[in-house]
Structures are given as C-alpha cells and as structure tokens.
Swiss-Prot record:
A motif (Polymerase core binding) lies at residues 335-348. The gene is SIGF. It is found in: Plastid, Chloroplast. Interacts (via N-terminus) with DG1 (via C-terminus). It comes from Arabidopsis thaliana. Sigma factors are initiation factors that promote the attachment of plastid-encoded RNA polymerase (PEP) to specific initiation sites and are then released. Regulates transcription in chloroplast in a DG1-dependent manner. Involved in light-dependent chloroplast development. Required during early plant development and primary leaf formation. This is RNA polymerase sigma factor sigF, chloroplastic. Keywords: Chloroplast, DNA-binding, Phosphoprotein, Plastid, Sigma factor, Transcription, Transcription regulation, Transit peptide. Changing residue 176 to A: Normal sigma factor activity upon phosphorylation but green seedlings. The keyword Cytoplasm does not apply. Residues 62-79 have a biased composition (Basic and acidic residues).
Length: 547
C-alpha cells in the first residue's frame, strides 16, 4: 500500500476530467514523476481527484494497513502534528485549485471535445486500480515508465489537435496548464507552443469550415464599411456609411424637423441682418437679434445642421428608388442620384409639419420633379421642351403596347392612332427628336474609321457636275449671240451672267439713259427670242443642273 500511495500521488496520467489538462500540457509532470519515485511525497490534489474513482474496498483497506506503521509514528507528537497540518494545507490548496480549474473549463467551450475524448478512451481508472493495489515497490519504476509513455502519447495528441485551433483555445490551454503546474520541482518550458503560434501567424487564414465543424460568422455591417467601397460602384459610394441604413420613427422625424425649422428661422434673421447692415453679422449681433446668448445660438445652429444632415442621410435610399425608374433616358445613374439629392435637400427646406403627412411622402415629389427637370434640360445635345418629352413618352408606351399585342413592328399609322396624333405630326416629332451622332465617332468598334472620313461634303461639286455646268455656260453664251449687243448687255446685267451681280431695272436705265419701262420692254423681247431658239440648241439637257 505504501507503493500504491506513492504511485497515486505522483502519476499524472491517471487523472479525471478536471485534472486532465494539467497532466499533458507541460512536461514538468514527467520530471516530478521521476523525483517522486526516489522520494515519495503525497500530492493531496491528485490523491483527492483519484479517490473519487477508487473502489470503497481499496479505500477502506488503506487506513487499516496504515494503522500499523502509524502506531509507531504517533509516539512522536511533533511529527504527527506536522503531518496533519500539511494534509489540511494541501487539501485547502487543492480545493481552491480545483475550483479555479473548473471555472476555466466552463469558460473554455471546446476543451472537452478536443482534449478529453482521446484520453478517456485509452486510460480506464478502474482497470488500473486492481494492479496498483497489489503492486510492490520494485514495480513502481516500471509503472512510472508506462505513465511517462502515456503522457508522451497525450502530448502528441495535443500537438495534433492544436494544428488548427483558434487563438482563444490556445490561450486558455496555456493559461490553465500554467495554473495547474505544481509548485515544487523543476519546470521545463516547451518551445513547441511558441513555434506553433509563429507558424499560424505566417500561414494564411482560410474561410473554409474547420475539422471541428466551425463555420466563420458573416462579417458585420460595420466591418463591411471599414473594408472600403469599390470606386466604380456609384450606388455603394452614394449609400456609404451605416447612417443610410437606419430608418427614422415618426417621433424621431418630428424632433429632427422641429430642430430644422428653428435653424431656418435663425438663418432668416441672419439674412435680414445682412440686407440691413450690408455685411454678414457677427455671432453676438445675431444672438442679440434673436434674444439669446451666443453659446445657446451656437448650440442651436449645430443641432439644426446635424439634424438636417441626419434627415437627408436617412432618406437617401428613397432617392435611389426614384432614380432607378429614370435610367436609360439620357443621363447616367450618378447624375440622377445627384439631381435627386438636390431635390431631397430642397424638400427639407420646404416641408411643413402642419401638412399632416410623413416627410418621405412630401420629399418623393420634389425628388421626382428634380430628376425629370434635369432629364429635360441635359439629356440631349439639343434641348427639347417638356411637352415634346411627354409626347415621346406616349409614343414609347404605344410601341410597348403593340409589342405586347403581338405586333413587333408597328407602322406609323398604328402608333399615331394609339397616341392620338396625326401621321404628319408623328413624322415631324420623330424627325426633330433624332439623336445626333458625332462625326469623330468610329463606325466599327474594331477599326478607327470615323463618320467624317466616309461622309461626303455636299458643298463640294462632283467632277461630273462641274464639267456639266461649264458646258452649260458655254452653250448659254453661244445662245446669246442671236441677240443684239444692247439686248445681250441688258440680259447679262439683269441676271448677273459672267460673274456680275444682278441689277434692277432702274440701275440698268441709269446706265443706258433709259426709263425703267423701256428697259423692261427690251428685256421681254430678248427673253422671247431666246425661247424661240432654245429648242433648236437642245438646252433642255441642262435642266437637272439648274438649282
């Protein structure tokens, strides 16, 4: 029984769940095992934990066998008193350590599944009790070696299980192992844990499911906003910040609007002072005009501006909802969001709480009006009036209706009938609302040929037309030879032939000293003679060249 008691007090590999952590977390337990084989010292902490699992017969035999050697020891009062005091002290210390260790295990959620399951299947305490009860002192060394091998196996299992654990489990293991080490004996610090931590820091963390079934939680909203936004995503940049996700209650909205109304009153007084004094008033003058102190004025201004910003930010999603309805109408999505924001800010200034509706209901129409107005003015190179846009919208709706009915290519007459206008007005509308193209725009995406390179210039005559006009001029000069010199000169001055400008009858009369009537008579007679000879010269071939 003496050997049994020494083995129980020294062997750390036959502990229960509460002391299983301290048995393999550090190699110091192995050092204590070899020290206690030579000098047996009872460790009350392990003895108390193991006594729970020993049979009652073994525990009852131990005091009977110990009574014989203790009967001689009781003669020395001093020795017995020291022994009792030491046992009481050890029991008190072990009870406190047990309570601390149990609290640590309760806070560490994954320790039982990680550490206890592989060891409880290999170490069965009741199976070891029977050989330990009859063991001799010579067998203590052999049993200690077995305990040492078991502790090494446990340490290897811990190394395998700690390959992919979280940092909090590692910290709890190291903390509990350091607290459960015995105070006596040499402590050997292992560097494996430091090496594993350094290796885990260098290794990239994966988001996949771990071996224990741990699934990482989704990133919270704040973490997502801290990660940054994509510069190309206009919607993400516009709704940047968690404030845009918060909805306001009716009470909060009424409070913010009251602060904004008070700020508008302050700004109105400031504008009045500017018009009176011709310059911007100071804070003191402004506060005196309002009948309040300067600190109170500053506080009201700050509160009003922050309330206005909060109200605008909370309704930005309404701007996005309305802007999406006007996409692909000539403005990109960013411009629609900006124009809608301007309408929202204007609605904040125009809103009256006495209207009896929520702010979002009132702001909807201001946002819509601002976006529509911007489309009318800026969506086209040539600005069109609003009524033309309304008519174009009706034409577009008529096309959609015809497609839904099965007519995928409606004629102009059918569209005019759906819209309620004439065909001529529809043609004029479609002609005036054509989208102009840039002459520098490439015709094909894979080539650099532009419209300017292939579009002919209507101001430049073709070689065929130029030669035809030259022949016509020579033919006309030959035809004028049938007239008298005076008539020929009057015709040339009257119609600007040979590069001259056209002259009036009075100007020609002044040149020849004739009246206007006489010049007209000469002109009529000359034209009549030309008509008589035109058929014989074949001038009808030049009819296409006359403009």
């Amino acid at each position: 029984m003496e050997a049994t008691r020494n083995l129980v007090s020294s062997s750390p590999s036959f502990q229960t769940k509460t002391h299983l952590k301290s048995s393999y977390s550090s190699p110091s337990s192995v050092v204590m095992l070899h020290d206690q084989t030579t000098t047996p010292v009872v460790n009350s902490r392990h003895l108390n934990s193991l006594s729970r699992h020993f049979p009652a017969s073994v525990l009852s035999q131990e005091p009977r066998e110990e009574s014989r050697p203790l009967s001689h020891a009781l003669r020395d009062d001093r020795t017995s008193q020291l022994t009792l005091e030491r046992r009481q002290f050890d029991e008190l210390v072990s009870s406190r350590e047990d309570e601390k260790f149990e609290q640590q295990l309760l806070h560490s959620t994954g320790l039982w599944n990680l550490l206890i399951s592989p060891l409880t299947s290999e170490t069965k305490l009741p199976a070891v009790v029977s050989p330990l009860a009859d063991a001799e002192l010579c067998d203590v060394v052999a049993l200690a070696q077995k305990a040492l091998s078991a502790s090494k196996q446990a340490a290897l299992l811990v190394d395998d299980t700690e390959a992919n654990p979280s940092d909090n489990i590692k910290d709890s293991l190291s903390t509990s192992s350091s607290m459960s080490l015995p105070e006596k004996g040499n402590i050997v610090r292992s560097k494996r844990q430091l090496e594993r931590r350094a290796k885990n820091r260098r290794a990239p963390k994966s988001n996949d499911v771990d071996d224990e079934g741990y699934v990482p939680q989704k990133t919270s909203a704040k973490k997502k906003y801290k990660q940054g936004a994509d510069n190309d995503d206009a919607l993400q940049l516009f709704l940047w910040g968690p404030e845009t996700k918060q909805l306001l209650t009716a009470k909060e909205e009424a409070e913010l609007i009251s602060h904004i109304q008070h700020l508008l009153k302050l700004e109105k007084v400031k504008t009045k002072l500017e018009s009176q004094n011709g310059c911007e008033p100071t804070i003191g003058e402004w506060a005196e005009a309002m009948g309040i102190s300067s600190p109170v004025l500053k506080s009201d201004i700050h509160r009003g501006r922050s309330s206005r910003e909060k109200l605008i930010t909370a309704n930005l999603r309404l701007v996005v909802h309305i802007a999406k309805q006007y996409q692909n109408r000539g403005l990109n999505f960013q411009d629609l969001l900006q124009e809608g924001s301007m309408g929202l800010m204007k609605s904040v200034e125009k809103f009256k709480p006495q209207s009896g509706c929520r702010f979002a209901t009132y702001a909807y129409w201001w946002i819509r009006q601002s976006i529509r107005k911007s489309i009318f003015q800026n969506s086209r190179t040539i600005r069109l009036p609003e009524n033309v846009y309304m008519l174009l919208g009706k034409v577009s709706e008529a096309r959609k209706t015809c497609v839904q009915e099965g007519n995928y290519r409606p004629s102009k007459e059918e569209l005019a009938g759906h819209v309620g206008v004439s065909t001529e007005k529809l043609d004029k509308l479609l002609y005036n609302t054509r989208t102009p193209l840039s002459m520098q725009q490439p015709i094909w995406s894979d080539q650099d040929t532009t419209f300017q390179e292939i579009t002919p210039d209507s101001g430049i005559e073709t070689p065929t037309m130029s030669v035809g006009k030259q022949l016509m001029r020579n033919h006309v000069r030959n035809l004028l030879n049938v007239l008298s010199p005076k008539e020929r000169r009057i015709i040339k001055l009257r119609f600007g032939i040979d590069g001259g400008k056209q002259r009036s009858l009075s100007e020609i009369g002044e040149i020849y000293g004739l009246s206007k009537e006489r010049v007209r008579q000469l002109e009529s007679r000359a034209l009549y003679r030309l008509k008589q000879n035109m058929n014989s010269h074949g001038l009808h071939a030049y009819a296409d060249l006359l403009v």
